[in-house]
């Protein structure tokens, strides 16, 4: 995955397990499936890229690179929430190493995630589940 702050958009990796049909009560299904996750990803990444305080992590990427990042995020979220996708990107610690992401950067990213989930009217339980899982990733993303 290109070095970029994907922060809380990325949830717990499924560890390369083979794709399985999503369980009917999986977070993937409860969020609305692939298309809903893709729409949330697009909005969230757009917010991050245009934010004056954290947009610096998106500078210098080609259109192709940005599309690959987008697809990695979608695949990660799909897989991590119990969907049928297989995430083939690097682990988050490796992907974010050397970027110097601070606690303030992390907190700002979480604010954008919350705003994105509100925009899409994600129900509270799903929002809570997603934010709790995202919180577990902070240790692999924040360096300072």
Residue ranges: model-predicted function:
Residues 1-7:
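Bacterial N-terminal signal peptides that target proteins for export
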């Amino acid at each position: 995955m290109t070095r970029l702050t994907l922060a809380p958009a990325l949830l717990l990796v499924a560890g390369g397990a083979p794709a399985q049909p999503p369980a009917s009560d999986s977070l993937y299904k409860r969020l609305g499936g692939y298309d809903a996750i893709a729409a949330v990803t697009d909005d969230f990444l757009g917010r991050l890229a245009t934010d004056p305080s954290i947009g610096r992590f998106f500078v210098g990427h080609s259109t192709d690179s940005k599309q690959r990042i987008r697809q990695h995020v979608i695949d990660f979220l799909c897989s991590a929430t119990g969907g049928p996708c297989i995430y083939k990107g690097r682990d988050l610690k490796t992907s974010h190493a050397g970027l110097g992401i601070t606690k303030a950067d992390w907190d700002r990213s979480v604010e954008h995630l919350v705003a994105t989930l509100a925009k899409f009217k994600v129900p509270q339980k799903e929002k809570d589940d997603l934010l709790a899982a995202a919180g577990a990733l902070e240790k692999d993303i924040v360096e300072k």
